[in-house]
Amino acid sequence: MSNDYSKLLGKITEKFGTQAKFANALGISERSVSLKLNNKISWKDSEIAKAIEVLEIDPENIPAYFFKYKVQQE
């Protein structure tokens, strides 16, 4: 099962404009961000913590950004 990062991507665009600027704020490569958003590699706990900080995500909303599963359409 894969995660739905559409809300996270919207927040990245709102705060940073591009994935590259967001990646720079996290201290990782743009490719790493892309792979994470496309469920190719997992987020490390430290990266999630940093993303929450730089995106100013309210702690109660964290699950909606990082732990929402994609729903399969039948």
Where is each model-derived feature located?
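Short, charged recognition helix plus adjacent turn
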Residues: 2, 10, 15-16, 35, ...
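Pre-recognition alpha-helix immediately N-terminal to the DNA-recognition helix
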Residues: 7-8, 50
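Key DNA-contact positions within bacterial/archaeal DNA-binding proteins
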Residues: 31, 42, 60
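Short, solvent-exposed alpha-helical "recognition" segments
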Residues: 40-46
